[in-house]
């Protein structure tokens, strides 16, 4: 967050597009630490089942950002201008740094030494070779990618098919974000009652149903706004339900590599989502057909990845 603070100040003083892009890149590098370290801290502080519940509620809180950010961002831009936005970023970063210094204790075991670059790479190889880790990481990756497929062309698609304005699409996006929050909240509640594995399967079932409904909606003539929006709401709910549980499971089996596992699983998800977003933009033709096909593919791959993770878990149980 100190890097984010410095980058925010640089962005506020930028005099060219290149400087602004560089500052924004450094902001992303700084703030990305939060998602990785948060998961490692949770893994260090809780046993697997409570950790999944904790991550579910953390994910729900993080899901609030897409709902309130556009509203507050628009108001702040009108009040203080675009440079003022970055001063606000810096102020928030300073507050977070102060809070971290005051209330956050070190959760890493005292007898754990810092890893060298070679040890980090060796740890990454161990994780990639582990069917359980790769299964959970890919489940999260493909579930996340399905959301990025829609995000890439969603505004243009809704404007073309239904004539929605930017403000109206912003409202729709807020509702979808609320659906994601509801899914993440439900993940914590259901995992306590059903267990993590069964809850993930419920989420995958909802994801399959949502994808099938979106495929039908993509070829309906005339296109129906309600069917499209229902399928996307279900998709975001499933995303919120599965993501925290898959992320928690990805760091369970190798607690000594919790930080590496958290960073690697997030990196894989970003790469997969970026690839799907690029493909979506390249094949977009003004219809939802391309999105539907890609969503069906990511849904099938998420099912395969979850089967891979469950198979690895069963093998470990038998050996034990």
PLM regions and their residue ranges:
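Paired small-residue
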Residues: 3-10, 18-26, 226-232
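Helix-breaking motifs and short loop linkers at transmembrane-helix boundaries and internal kinks
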Residues: 13-19, 30, 217-218
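Helix-loop-helix hairpin linking two adjacent transmembrane segments in secondary transporters
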Residues: 19, 48, 56-102
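Cytoplasmic helix-loop-helix junction between adjacent transmembrane helices
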Residues: 23-64
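A late C-terminal transmembrane helix in Major Facilitator Superfamily
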Residues: 247-286, 295
């Amino acid at each position: 967050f100190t890097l984010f603070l410095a980058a925010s100040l640089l962005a506020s003083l930028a005099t060219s597009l290149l400087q602004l892009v560089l500052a924004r890149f450094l902001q992303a590098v700084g703030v990305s630490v939060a998602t990785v370290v948060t998961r490692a801290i949770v893994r260090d502080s809780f046993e697997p089942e409570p950790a999944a519940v904790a991550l579910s509620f953390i994910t729900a809180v993080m899901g609030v950002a897409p709902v309130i950010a556009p509203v507050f961002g628009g108001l702040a831009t009108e009040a203080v201008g675009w440079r003022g936005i970055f001063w606000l970023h810096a102020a928030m970063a300073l507050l977070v740094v102060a809070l971290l210094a005051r209330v956050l204790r070190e959760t890493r075991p005292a007898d754990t030494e810092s890893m060298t670059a070679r040890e980090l790479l060796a740890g990454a190889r161990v994780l990639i070779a582990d069917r359980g880790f790769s299964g959970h990481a890919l489940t999260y990756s493909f579930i996340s990618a399905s959301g990025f497929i829609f995000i890439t062309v969603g505004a243009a698609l809704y404007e073309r098919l239904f004539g929605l304005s930017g403000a109206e699409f912003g409202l729709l996006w807020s509702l979808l974000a609320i659906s994601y929050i509801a899914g993440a909240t439900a993940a914590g509640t259901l995992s306590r009652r059903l267990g993590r594995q069964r809850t993930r399967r419920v989420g995958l079932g909802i994801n399959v149903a949502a994808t099938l409904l979106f495929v039908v909606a993509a070829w309906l003539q005339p296109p129906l706004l309600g069917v499209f929006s229902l399928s996307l709401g279900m998709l975001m709910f499933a995303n919120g339900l599965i993501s925290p549980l898959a992320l928690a499971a990805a760091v369970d089996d190798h607690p000594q590599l919790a930080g590496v596992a958290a960073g690697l699983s997030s990196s894989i998800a970003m790469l997969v989502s970026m690839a799907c977003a690029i493909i979506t933009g390249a094949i977009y033709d003004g219809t939802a057909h391309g999105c539907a096909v890609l969503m069906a593919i990511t849904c099938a791959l998420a099912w395969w990845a979850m089967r891979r993770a469950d198979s690895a878990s069963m093998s470990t149980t038998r050996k034990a």
